[in-house]
Amino acid sequence: MFKHEKRMLQEVKVERPNPQYAAMLQEQLGGPNGELKAGLQYISQSFRIKDPAIKDLFMDIGAEELSHMEMVAQTINLLNGHAVDVGSVDAGEIETHTLGGLAPMLVNASGAPWSANYVNVTGDIAADLLSNIAAEQGAKVVYEYLYRQINDRYVRQTIDFLLNREEAHNALFREALNRVQNKGSNKDFGVTEDSKLYFDLSSPTPPNHFNAPNPTPPGFKNPTQPGQ
């Protein structure tokens, strides 16, 4: 069950309207590394998870991502101002001014519509967790790019909060991956000789080249316990 609380996860505001910044932020609303993609991906993946704690983790983070989506959309709304003006956007998405009446739309920074193809669901807990770790890392990278280019201190505060939450989610998914070392596609990992071969097809071979692997299930040091 979901419910809507009439407050933001964290307050958002802007120094002044800037439709160009709004167009840039559309990437994290309707893009492949955006908040809608993340929320729907984690919630969709949760439906087949049997471990109650991991299922709750996916649902909790998915619900938080939808709260992030609300923050991004409201920031875009404030940056768009009060009058449609295509000329205020030097590059990127202009559908907001030609079609959406300044409403935040489910498109990326170039105006391409959001797609369910962005959502990765395999039904395999290990594969889904690795996909989610990559998704959180990718979202953090996009927020870092936006932070460098948006010169609005309040928008930067919002971006800083969001990218730090991506780091938290990344750490939680890594901890969950450590709990499923013998489940799903992690089971019987690296048990044949074929999995231990390395084909050196590059010539000449550099001095720091890779050698034949010794596959073990993907895992991480426990990110919530730095000493481990």
Residue ranges and their predicted role:
Residues M1-Q228:
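Non-heme di-metal
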